[in-house]
Amino acid sequence: MAGDFSNRAPWKRSACDRCRAQKLRCHRDSGHSTDACLRCLKSGIECVTSKARPTGRPPSRQVQPTVVVEQGDTSSSSHTTDSSPSAGGTDMSNMMNFEYDLSLDNILDSIGMQHSDFIVNDNILVDISPLSSSQSTSQHSVAQAQAQTVDPSTIQSTASYQFNTLPSTSSMDSALPMRSDHVELLLSRLHSKLSAQLYSIRSSPWDVKGTLNLSLAHQGIGQDFENCESHPLVQVSQACTELERLLSGLRAPASAEHTPSTFSYTPAVPPRLRITQLLIALSCYIQIVSIYGIIFSKVFDYLLSTSKTSVGSYQSSPLTLYIGGLPIPPNETLSGNLLVHLIEHQLHQIEQLMGLPEHYRVSSRAKDTKDGELGLFGSQHSQSLLNAAIQLGEDRDGNHDDIRCVRALKIVMRQIKDF
């Protein structure tokens, strides 16, 4: 019989399980092939030889039946089709009763290996699995910790901008570089505040006499802005400081042309800005000029209605200010002149950053300087946009023409100086 190794020749005998597992030659006594092999005899263990495989070419495998499941039928039915030729006349019931030995021991035995050879590998997998699970656990804990540290209140929708959550723009902040998009958002918030202030100063009464008061304090009255309602002059002054800082973030640094770099080229003129950025900056400037125009008009009307007397008549405790050791008299006209020069200096900084031409400025521009060439409206394209926007304001009917508010402020400030 092909599977009986006792009738085989010595050179066709099967190796024992131990030699087969170690892939070694199984040496036996040539006269006694059924005895234990020399390696097992030397080791003093039992020599076990499993059922031998038949020698020669293995028989061709029978074709397995293909199972087709019909999807349309509600009941689970299967049809078997034989892909082998029908010449043999094989019965389908015999094919279904065919036993397949797919055990692990049989598969390993067919390739000359034993299941015990994988014990070491199983131990390795057991040792690796806790490591991988610990790594996945640590990654999950880190991700969970990061998710817990995120404040849900800071998650905002990209469809709307919350201006209240933007950082403050006070002059005491450090001069950090800001993106132009961020500056545009801050300019939009400033524009909204100036619009509300312009409406309030036109519709609500305010203390005109307090504009000319001289006071001496360790802290400016602007420090009480968050605690109580401030004077319109303080509010617009704070808006000027904020606008000056934002314009500095949009304009290229003036030292760029004096600092050559061997690795990168820095242009002397600022990069071209978007139309929205230029228009919103110009609108903020026009609103500030309009607010100052209303304030100085009220102040000039107040000076005309009162006599040129000392402020001691309406100030409870007159203070004496000194400049160069000389006392400054508490006079209304002098207070008005000081206020005009202060506002001119404040507007000059903004107009210099914007690069406005002479006929669009409130302050006087020095003839020997080129402070407007590097401003926002210093380029030819920006000048064209500025002229178009100003001309549009001149053509429409109303009392809030843009160029007229600049001229009106210059006239009333000159009148206060000459009063």
Curated annotation (Swiss-Prot):
What does the entry list under GO cellular component?
A: nucleus
* DNA-binding segment(s): 16-47
Nucleus as UniProt keyword: yes
UniProt main location, coarse: nucleus
Compositional bias of kind Low complexity: 74-86
Where does this polypeptide localize? Nucleus
Instruction: Spell out the molecular function terms from Gene Ontology.
Output: DNA-binding transcription factor activity, RNA polymerase II-specific; zinc ion binding
Biotech use, in short, is: Fusaric acid is phytotoxic to plants such as cotton and banana. It has been shown to induce programmed cell death in plants. In addition to a mild toxicity to animals, fusaric acid exhibits acanthamoebicidal, antioomycete, and antimycobacterial activities.
Q: Does the keyword Nucleus apply?
A: yes
Could you tell me which Pfam families the record lists for this protein? Zn_clus
**Which keywords does UniProt give here?**
Nucleus
Q: Where is this region: Disordered?
A: 50-92
Q: What does this protein do?
A: Transcription factor that regulates the expression of the gene cluster that mediates the biosynthesis of fusaric acid, a mycotoxin with low to moderate toxicity to animals and humans, but with high phytotoxic properties.
UniProt-recorded name of the protein: Fusaric acid cluster transcription factor FUB10
* Species: Gibberella fujikuroi (strain CBS 195.34 / IMI 58289 / NRRL A-6831) (Bakanae and foot rot disease fungus)
Gene it is expressed from: FUB10
